[in-house]
Swiss-Prot record:
Start-end of IBR-type zinc fingers: 232-293
Signal peptide: none
Pathway(s) annotated for this protein in UniProt: Protein modification; protein ubiquitination
Enzyme Commission code(s) on record: 2.3.2.31
Protein name (record): E3 ubiquitin-protein ligase arih1l
Binding-site list for Zn(2+) 6: 348, 351, 358, 365
Enzymatic reactions: [E2 ubiquitin-conjugating enzyme]-S-ubiquitinyl-L-cysteine + [acceptor protein]-L-lysine = [E2 ubiquitin-conjugating enzyme]-L-cysteine + [acceptor protein]-N(6)-ubiquitinyl-L-lysine
Keywords: Coiled coil, Cytoplasm, Metal-binding, Repeat, Transferase, Ubl conjugation pathway, Zinc, Zinc-finger
Length: 533
């Protein structure tokens, strides 16, 4: 395929030193020999709004801690833009190409096939079976590219039909891959745009010919697509593959944020993006200390499955005493027949006992003392008790989540109060206690919210009682602090406000620290036992 002037990996020994200072990219499928230097020709195509939301100066290249109020300040990370991720990709491709000496876009496809694991690629590359390797990666071996057949005088001078749209075009309007299948430029552009925009495909776009699995290289894509938005989307798809395969990289989960967080080692630790979103690097959810990722994932799934219907189920259904399928009573008759095709049990709605002993007295159930009916009712009660337990923790979890949303709005109110205080002979530094108090309040709300997830899966023991006492103490102090900031801030004198708020937020900080330290100590000493849901 002809090379492109744009999104291109150029290799040139004479310009190696100059190229090292320029931005780099991912390239073509050129047949020329590959040298040492690597250049990204179209980094300028990346719109900051798409690439990362901010220009390069927004990247936290010096690393960072988890943010205010968090305990682990040794977990280093940096926030990267899409341009910087692209440069990391180019460096990875350059490292491999120093050894295998292939066109850069071919190397990119090989690396993608091995999930960007350079060691695995090298091992396979030198195991002596290159033909099999390139076949598995769906590319033509660059050292064995088929010779291009010369066009006859007749075919080169006459219009030819495209095998997709069947319109006639001059031969110069056709292009294709090393597999030899050629189509018109318009069909190529439409095909690639559909694959990228509608199907979300980037690294696995194959030749449009029937039963041809040869992959389209980056240079071909960037040459044949004219819409800059489609090019940006393609670049994002390629970089997404690189990020998803790298255990040290994670996309920021905030909507419309295209930053990537890079860490020195993967762990369930808090990281903060430049957009302000703080999340757990391990699972990508909002930072959720003290509950572990495993239990939070189970909780989120349970809430998604249960929260909207649990109240209705509790009030309107019972379980089949045989197969435990949930059954709704749709008539006045108490003679129930389970509609589970593998069950078909007949039972009494009132006592949940077998229907057969009821005889003709279906309207006047007298089986309450039967052992089998009692066992069925016991099972039903256990199910209801489990549901009530879930609702207990879910309601408190959701309540703290809602309070946290409201208290984020306190910042505007507090800012206004801080300005008023500065007009009453208080310095800017002296009024910072109010912002600090709101910070602590939000941290405590977040911690309390996740303590209910932790408690839901926690088995009762002596340590769990201590945990619940710490939880209750922190919850009470948090509510008092919330009251100070929402009501007393506009009523009390300035000195009274300052003393009350400072004392309470320091106490909240202390109790939050005690609670988290106790939970972490339990993790270290294996003190916690869990209820498998």
């Amino acid at each position: 395929m002809d090379s492109d002037e744009g999104y291109n990996y150029e290799f040139d020994d004479e310009e190696e030193e100059e190229e090292e200072e320029e931005e780099c990219s991912v390239d073509s499928g050129e047949e020329e020999a590959v040298d040492d230097s690597l250049e990204l020709g179209e980094v300028e195509l990346l719109d900051p709004a798409v690439a990362g939301g901010e220009p390069d100066d927004c990247a936290d290249t010096g690393g960072g801690g988890p943010g205010p109020g968090q305990e682990d300040e040794d977990y280093r990370f940096e926030v990267l833009t899409t341009e910087q991720i692209l440069q990391h990709m180019v460096e990875c491709i350059r490292d491999v190409n120093e050894v295998i000496q292939n066109p850069a876009t071919i190397t990119r496809i090989l690396l993608s096939h091995f999930n960007w694991d350079k060691e695995k690629l090298m091992e396979r590359y030198f195991d002596g079976n290159l033909d099999k390797l390139f076949s598995e990666c769906h590319v033509i071996n660059p050292s064995k590219k088929p010779k291009t057949r010369p066009m006859s005088t007749r075919s080169s001078s006459q219009d030819l039909p495209c095998q997709i749209c069947y319109l006639n075009y001059p031969n110069s309007y056709f292009t294709g891959l090393e597999c030899g299948h050629k189509f018109c430029m318009q069909c190529w552009g439409d095909y690639l745009t559909t694959k990228i925009i509608e199907e979300g495909m980037g690294q696995t776009i194959s030749c449009p010919a029937h039963n041809c699995d040869i992959l389209v290289d980056d240079n071909t894509v960037m040459r044949l697509i004219t819409d800059s938005k489609v090019k940006l989307k393609y670049q994002h798809l390629i970089t997404n593959s690189f990020v998803e395969c790298n255990r040290l990289l994670k996309w920021c989960p905030a909507p419309d944020c295209h930053h990537v967080v890079k860490v020195q080692y993967p762990d369930a630790k808090p990281v903060r993006c430049k957009c302000g979103r703080q999340f757990c690097f391990n699972c990508g959810e909002n930072w959720h200390d003290p509950v572990k990722c495993k239990w939070l994932r189970k909780w989120i799934k349970k809430c998604d499955d249960d929260s909207e219907t649990s109240n209705w189920i509790a009030a309107n259904t019972k379980e089949c005493p045989k197969c435990h399928v949930t059954i709704e009573k749709d008539g006045g008759c108490n003679h129930m027949v389970c509609r589970n095709q593998n069950c078909k049990a007949e039972f009494c709605w009132v006592c949940l006992g077998p229907w057969e002993p009821h005889g003709s007295a279906w309207y006047n159930c007298n089986r309450y003392n039967e052992d089998d009916a009692k066992a069925a009712r016991d099972a039903q009660e256990r199910s209801r008790a489990a549901l009530q337990r879930y609702l207990f923790y879910c309601n408190r979890y959701m309540n703290h989540m809602q309070s946290l949303r409201f208290e984020h709005k306190l910042y505007a109110q507090v800012k206004q109060k801080m300005e008023e205080m500065q007009q009453h002979n208080m310095s800017w530094i002296e009024v910072q206690f109010l912002k600090k108090a709101v910070d602590v309040l939000c941290q405590c709300r977040s911690t309390l919210m996740f303590t209910y997830v932790f408690a839901f899966y926690l088995k009762k023991n002596n340590q769990s009682i201590i945990f619940e006492n710490n939880q209750a103490d922190l919850e009470n102090a948090t509510e008092v602090l919330s009251g100070y900031l929402e009501r007393d801030i506009s009523q009390d004198s300035l000195q009274d406000i300052k003393q009350k708020v400072q004392d309470k937020y320091r106490y909240c900080e202390s109790r939050r620290r005690v609670l988290l330290q106790h939970v972490h100590e339990g993790y270290e000493k294996d003190l916690w036992e869990y209820i498998e849901d």
